[in-house]
Amino acid sequence: MKTRKSLSTLLIVAASVFMPSKVNAQDPEPNDYTDGSAWLCRPDQQDACAVDLSTTVIAADGMISLEGWSSDPSAPIDCFYVYPTVSTDQSTNSDMTPDAAELRVIEQQFARFASVCRPYAPSYRQVTLAGLMATFAGGGPRDLEQGLAYNDVRDAFQHYLEYDNGGRGFVLIGHSQGSYILTRLIRDEIEGHPVQDQMISAFLLGSTVTVAAGEDTGGSFQNIPLCRSAGQTGCVITYASFRSTAPPPQNTLFGQTLEPTLTGACTNPAALGGGSSETHAYLSSGGATIAGPRRTSPWVSSGAAVETPFVSVPGLLSAECTSNEHATYLEITVHGDPSDDRVDDIVGDITPQWGLHLVDVNLAMGDLVQIVQEQTAAWEERR
């Protein structure tokens, strides 16, 4: 049975095994990506991206205002998204029938980008949380960027390029398993190939991207650098978020590498040039994360009803890339004030080694969407 509870439970149990994981499959048939049902989102269909993303903006004094949202079917570029490990299927790899978790993650992480780009999100036979645990228990190698899941995404991307792209620029967006898959896709299919000129940027979130120590390249990619301004294109944005009060422990799942000449990369979407800045978060009003609902306390002390699916909390959160002895990460500071009328904390924690993985994307969603808009303008100007 696919339930929110089972997903949350599997996330906790899988914490000790969340590294990329190889899956043994007996040459299954490739997916038919000419079939619209093989896509969670496409710009030409009503699907998982066609959701209400209206937002209640809550100021520190408890004052409330409403913010609408709409997609832009004529957006000049495309976004191609690969979602994280969320499937509650009990098989090693998920099937191609989306469950509630796969639909929810589109709402939380990707649908909002449709205001600045045409959305493409293929369904794929990802390694499930149950599959991760089974592989670990069997002592097998752990590599999420190989096997059936990678093959599906590669096939979907190749189909997109051949039949949908038409020479347009694109942004790759991934989280967790999706980011590891996209990292390999960039290495194998994009870097050093003509299509690299069309890659406006890649958002590889909630994973570990490496660079040579003190450099912006030289690890995961040889020539594709980290993004250091919103006007820069052909670059990568990557981070894994942790609370300022709970930095990565020794057994962290993100932001570290065993290679002595490499280091984990971090780019702050709220301040690509460096330093600390307020983030533009879009949080679920019901406390939902990619693992299901969490929040029980009201957003404002008055108990005023929040009737939109999302909330924005200006000034509550700030972010800065930093390092400790274990990892490089995006440090999230919560500026709660018990004397004001607004909520003082956020949800998203699981165990210390995960950090705020469940809300990595939500924490800076507004910043990421704005970056796509600015990078698109810069890319078009240089064409």
For the regions a language model picked out, list residue spans one by one:
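Gly/Ala-rich beta-loop-alpha elbow adjacent to hydrolase catalytic centers
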Residues: 174, 178, 182
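Surface cap/lid and interfacial helix-loop subdomains adjacent to catalytic sites
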Residues: 147-166, 187-341, 378, 382
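Active-site catalytic motif of lipid deacylating hydrolases and related acyltransferases
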Residues: 37, 43-45, 72-75, 81-169, ...
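N-terminal module-boundary/linker segments of secreted carbohydrate-active enzymes
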Residues: 26-65
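C-terminal segment of classical bacterial N-terminal signal peptides
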Residues: 16-23
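Bacterial N-terminal signal peptides that target proteins for export
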Residues: 1-10
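N-terminal post-signal-peptidase region of extra-cytosolic proteins
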Residues: 62-66, 104-106, 185-188
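Active-site-proximal beta-strand/loop segments in catalytic clefts of secreted hydrolases
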Residues: 82-85, 123-127, 175-176, 204-208, ...
